[in-house]
Each structure stands twice: as C-alpha cells, then as structure tokens.
Amino acid sequence: MNKNILFIGANGYMGHGMSLNLLKQNNLYVIANKQRKNIENLIKEGAKEINSYEEIKDIELNCLMLCVTNTPIAIEIAKKVSPLLKNTTLVIDLTTHNKNGTKEMKNIFDKFKISFVVSPVMGSKNESLKGVLGSLWGGDQNKFEESKIYLDTFCENIFNFGSVEKACAAKLLSNFLSLLTTTTVIEYFKSAKKLDVDWRKLFEAAKLGSGNSGALGRIAEKAISGDYKGYSFSVSNTLKDLTYINDLLKDLPNAE
C-alpha cells in the first residue's frame, strides 16, 4: 500500500498496536505527547517522528488517524491540525466520542473541505496488536472503500453504520453492552467464591447456557488460573464511557 500516514495517539493503549500494523505496509509518522515508550518502539520499527503539528505542512499525507482519550482532547487537536492539512488527506477518527463529538469534529474539518470519517474500534490491546479489531465506521459513503484500505491493516471486520453520528451511537451502545456483561461476569465469580462454588465447573456449565459470552470467556479462562487481567479496562475509561452512555440514553422513554 505504501501510504503516508500520521497517527496521533500512537503511544496509547490501543494506538500502539494499530500503528505497528500500519507500519508493515506504509510510511508512518508519529508525534509524542507525554509518554514516549511506545513511540520509541515504533521509531525502532521504522516510523518517523514529527516534533510539532506545523511539520504536517511539509508532508504529503494520504491519511491522518486519530485515537485519543476523549472528545475534548480530539476537538483541541482537530482545531490545531485542520488548517495545516491538504484537502486530499483523509481523516479517520478512531476515538470514542460523546454523542455530539463526531458531529463537532466533522464540522471542524468541513470548514477546510477535508474528508472526515469515524471508525471507533471494538477489542482490546491484544486484538490491536494482532490486527483483528472490529470497526464501527461512519461518514461520507464515497470514502468507505478508501477508509478500508487503511482499516484492513488492523481490523478483522468493518461495519458501515452510515453517518458519523450513527457510528458514534453504535460504539457507545456496544460499550454499554460490554460493561454490563463484564460487570455481571465479575459479580458471578465473586459470588461463587463467597459461596465456595468451584469456578472451573461453574464456568464449564455456564458455557452451555444462554449466559455464555465473550466477556465470560475472556475473564474466566485466566481468572481460574489466578490471572485477573483477562479483560483489561481502566476505571477512568469506564467512567468516561458510562458518562457518555448516560448522556446518549438519558432522554429515551425508558430512561430513569
């Protein structure tokens, strides 16, 4: 493929794995924020580092990818980079946004006639490194095939939800389901421990019923052997997602 790509957020929990996969077929540019460990690793693998957004003007970027912590940070970056990009650059935003975030981001890039699409991903750090994430894509339908060129390097499945707003809602609903099932699985095994019920037998029995799930498998397989990191998700990210989810759903008829 050999495209020029700038990845903002390459040092992050998910961004590092995605960047490593992009590097296999492309010229990858990265920029550091505070932490440098993963950036240094990417440079060793062949990535090129830029020291400021101003350097964007000197690069013929085919694609800018963005994967940052939250909507306010993404918007701040968008305002800085949008005047520096050529209108031939495709912006793919991988960030999990609040319900208005993707629309705000699109409006910023629209002012400069820059194509903007979103593609929040499903999966963990391990799936990111293996290149088998799931993508929830949204944007101008004319840009879907072009987006796939980049996303195929680290995504196993790409689902087209139509608009950026629909893709954002789909991501938050997916995270809502993940958080609910994960919490249930954790409480399930905590209760079993208190009641002195064998975890292995309980897990094998649960897999045969309707309670079987991806969360059950990811957590239980390792927890039974004493490894409680089968499903890594930070408290801060959980709080962020629940805040965004509450804002999305609060006006629905069944909200309380």
Residue ranges and their predicted role:
Residues 1-59, 63-66, 125:
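NAD(P)+-binding Rossmann beta1-loop-alpha1 motif at the extreme N-terminus of oxidoreductases
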Residues 8, 97-175:
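Rossmann-fold dinucleotide-binding core
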Residues 14, 18-19, 105, 150, ...:
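Hydrophobic residues within alpha-helices
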Residues 28, 49, 116-117, 158, ...:
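Hydrophobic beta-strand scaffold residues
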Residues 53-116:
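Rossmann-fold NAD(P) dinucleotide-binding segment
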Residues 130-138, 159, 163-195, 204-218:
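Active-site-proximal catalytic alpha-helix in oxidoreductases
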Residues 168, 214-256:
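Interdomain hinge/lid region at the active-site interface
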